[in-house]
Curated annotation (Swiss-Prot):
Molecular functions per Gene Ontology: DNA binding; DNA-binding transcription factor activity, RNA polymerase II-specific; lipid binding
Residue ranges of the annotated DNA-binding region, renumbered to this chain: 66-125
Coiled-coil residue spans: 166-187
InterPro entries according to UniProt: GLABRA2/ANL2/PDF2/ATML1-like, HD, Homeobox_CS, Homeodomain-like_sf, START-like_dom_sf, START_lipid-bd_dom
Principal localisation: nucleus
Keyword field: Coiled coil, DNA-binding, Homeobox, Nucleus, Transcription, Transcription regulation
Keyword Protein biosynthesis belongs to the record: no
CDD domains membership: homeodomain, START_ArGLABRA2_like
GO annotations of cellular component type: nucleus
The name this protein goes by in its record: Homeobox-leucine zipper protein TF1
Entry's family note: Belongs to the HD-ZIP homeobox family. Class IV subfamily.
Keyword Transcription part of the UniProt annotation: yes
Entry's localization field: Nucleus
Organism whose genome encodes this protein: Oryza sativa subsp. japonica (Rice)
Length: 709
């Protein structure tokens, strides 16, 4: 073996062979035919050393030779090779020769390094793919199990079948007995006599509960009562829950619930409606990390960027310890939003309690503490998450969202979707599954070697901020920072709002948000696929302006192929001298709601974020982006007649379009009328272009335009 040149440190000639040694003292080297051959390690060392001039062939100082330690590549050599590998994984002979001269390594060392690196990347990708398939298998098994249970224990309240009624009665009796036993255990552990009515009653004593907020014992007892009620709701397979066909979530059987937990439901008397759903999903994250995201207000908001617009801890009754959040009780105020101007945001104050039931089994409980003198539009009944560890770095999460809410401000277009989709349990677990899968993909997936892990993290955080800004601008949340100028938010009455800002260029002092919600007679799946289609992008996207759009790189993948963070570039024909426009896009698909949000980003800023070794600053200290995008929701009312088909595959779509642009305010913080008029005209034209593109693509299915009767 002939080396290209000698090095300053002779032992570096062995670096290329380090990964090729077998446990039997032999080394494996690929020959020109990519076939493996085995050579005794000692003879191989002697041959290489003699050939490179480091030691004579017949040297008698074999003991000294044996004691020599192999040295790894220096940091600079590794940096050069890693950097070139991120650009080209298969260098030609000329590139290998140049790398050899740059790093001081031999040609064979460079060759073997790239071979080993390719094998390493391929192995890591295979392991990651195998892990994702195993998680998907667990999800399908759990779904199959729940479908079988629902099929075998189906309950019809309008049926006169005595066996079904007997089954419901037996289940109610079991639940009542379990609830009574749990209450007695709580009373025994607290050293207090059991109460006369052991059922959990939140609504019957709101004044009493709020007046005792500062009573530690009372707070702890209320939290434990809610915990046991949540466990019963999470583990019950019959009677209490009705599966929704094709929706992957369940709704509460209110009649059975009232029998299990009797008490006056005074909330309904003052106009509150009950929304109660349950959903299960696999999360690619260990259960302790999930608890950390749920218990910390900042992490809680960033983990659900399109769901939570604000979260704050009002008071901590039991502080966390070095062991974690076990036993922590805290009072939180959370503002939840849905990306549509026709659905008002919800602000709810509740008690959050974390308890470790067993090793690998944790429950996080939410229950409201409402003062009777303060009108609240959202009150939480026992809700929360049951988190069960399945295997290392993955767990099963059962979410229950049970609230009493005043939805008088919800538009009739979204009224059928309120109990289950808009603020339901399915949306919580879908977001958890998506975020955890993306976080894992950022660190473990090596399919985009041209972007470093640090750069992928930066772009991932920027994509989350982009989604949060888009949803917040549409819902006009954020403590009243948005001022609505005109419009209700429908197709015929486009809403325009603005907020002051100090970000971005000094020539602009405000951000203008334009949004509208409308119904499309196409399934959500077809609408989502059309919007993501890069070939048709130039037909409706004013940001592209007829350019050719191509995908540059995928930063992170979530649960499926429709859930990605990507960098796109668009190039206009005949304008090569102007370079390319970069677009950061964040999109996800789920039956509980889909989205596609994107923003133009400067290519120099993109390179800085990808190559910079530092993290993005927290909060709003990062680059200023102005999101444009779509929020999609399946029309539940139109899909009711197609039972058994997955939600979103049939029926219509409730689509919300929105974009934000920087503007300059007039004196007195007033909006220029021409700015609002131009924004409304731009939104109207975009809606027309999207409808036209949909009509042209699906005219063969509908025969005529689906947008006209």
């Amino acid at each position: 073996m002939e080396m290209n040149q000698q090095h300053n440190e002779g032992n570096e000639s062995f670096v290329a062979l380090m990964n090729g040694f077998a446990g039997d003292g032999t080394a494996t080297l690929p020959n020109d035919g990519e076939q493996r051959m085995s050579i005794p390690a000692r003879e191989l060392f002697a041959a290489i050393e003699a050939d490179s001039g480091l030691l004579p062939v017949n040297s008698s100082n074999t003991n000294e030779k044996r004691k020599r330690r192999l040295q790894r590549l220096t940091g600079k050599q590794s940096e050069v090779l890693e950097g070139f590998f991120s650009i080209c994984g298969h260098p030609d002979d000329g590139q290998k020769r140049h790398l050899s001269e740059t790093t001081g390594l031999g040609l064979d060392q460079v060759k073997f390094w790239f071979q080993n690196k390719r094998t390493q990347v391929k192995t890591m990708c295979w392991k990651e793919e195998n892990y994702k398939l195993s998680v998907e298998n667990e999800i399908l098994r759990d779904e199959n199990r729940r479908v079988k249970i629902a099929h075998c224990t189906a309950v019809c309240l309008t049926c006169c079948n005595s066996s079904v009624q007997n089954q419901l009665a037996v289940e109610m009796e079991r639940l009542m007995g379990q609830s009574e036993w749990l209450q007695q255990e709580i009373a025994r552990s607290n050293g207090t006599p059991p109460a006369a009515n052991l059922a959990f009653q939140l609504n019957s004593s709101a004044d009493y509960v709020f007046s005792g907020q500062h009573d530690q014992q009372m707070i702890a007892e209320l939290a434990k009562n809610a915990m046991h009620a949540l466990i019963i709701l999470a583990e019950s397979h019959v009677a209490l829950w009705f599966p929704v066909p094709g929706c992957s979530y369940e709704v509460l059987n209110k009649m059975a619930y009232d029998q299990a937990y009797p008490g006056d439901n005074s909330a309904n008397a003052i106009g509150f409606k009950t929304e109660a759903t349950r959903a299960v999903s696999m999360v690619m994250m260990d259960y302790k990390s999930v608890v950390d995201f749920l218990m910390d207000p900042y992490n809680y908001r960033t983990f659900f960027p399109e769901v939570i617009s604000g979260a704050v801890t009002n008071r901590i009754y039991t502080w966390p310890t070095s062991d974690g959040y076990n036993g922590v009780i805290q009072l939180m105020t959370v503002e939840m939003m849905f990306p549509s101007p026709l659905v008002p945001a919800r602000k709810c104050t509740f008690l959050r309690y974390c308890n470790v039931l067993n090793e690998g089994l944790v429950v996080v409980i939410d229950v409201s503490l409402d003062d009777g003198s303060i009108f609240s539009k959202c009150r939480k009944m026992p809700s929360g998450f049951l988190i069960q560890s399945i295997r290392p770095n993955s767990c099963k999460v059962t979410a229950i969202e049970h609230v009493l809410a005043d939805d008088t401000g919800v538009h009739e277009l979204y009224q059928p979707c309120m109990n289950g989709l808009v603020f339901g349990a399915r949306r919580w677990v879908a977001t958890m599954a998506r975020q955890s899968a993306r976080m894992r993909d950022v660190h473990h997936n090596k399919t985009a070697p041209q972007v470093s892990t640090k750069g992928r993290k930066n772009l991932m955080k920027l994509a989350d901020d982009l989604l949060a800004s888009f949803a917040g601008g549409i819902a006009a949340t954020g403590g009243g920072t948005w001022t609505v100028v005109i419009g209700a938010g429908t197709e015929k009455d486009i809403r325009v709002a603005y907020r002051r800002t100090t970000e971005g260029s000094s020539s602009y002092n405000a951000i203008l948000s334009v949004t509208a919600s409308l119904r499309l007679p196409l399934p959500m799946r077809k609408t989502f696929d059309l919007l993501r289609n890069l070939t048709h992008r130039c037909k409706w996207d004013v940001l592209v302006h007829g350019s050719v759009v191509k995908e540059e790189v995928t930063i992170a993948r979530g649960v499926g192929n429709d859930d990605t963070v990507t960098v796109l570039h668009c190039k206009r024909a005949g304008r090569e001298d102007r370079g390319r426009t970069m677009i950061l896009q964040n999109n996800g698909y789920d039956a509980s709601g889909s989205f596609m949000v994107y923003s133009q980003i400067d290519s120099e800023l993109m390179n800085t974020m990808v190559l910079s070794p530092s993290d993005l600053p927290p909060g709003r200290g990062g680059p200023s982006l102005y999101p444009t995008g779509f929020s999609l929701l399946p029309d539940v009312e139109a899909a009711q007649d197609s039972s058994g088909i997955a939600l979103g595959e049939v029926g219509g779509t409730l689509m919300t379009m929105g974009f934000q642009i920087p503007v300059k305010l007039a004196s007195g913080d007033r909006m220029y009328s021409r700015s609002a008029a131009s924004a409304i005209r731009l939104m109207t034209d975009t809606i027309a272009l999207v409808k036209k593109t949909l009509m042209n693509e699906h005219s063969g299915i509908y025969g005529v335009s689906p947008f006209h009767p």
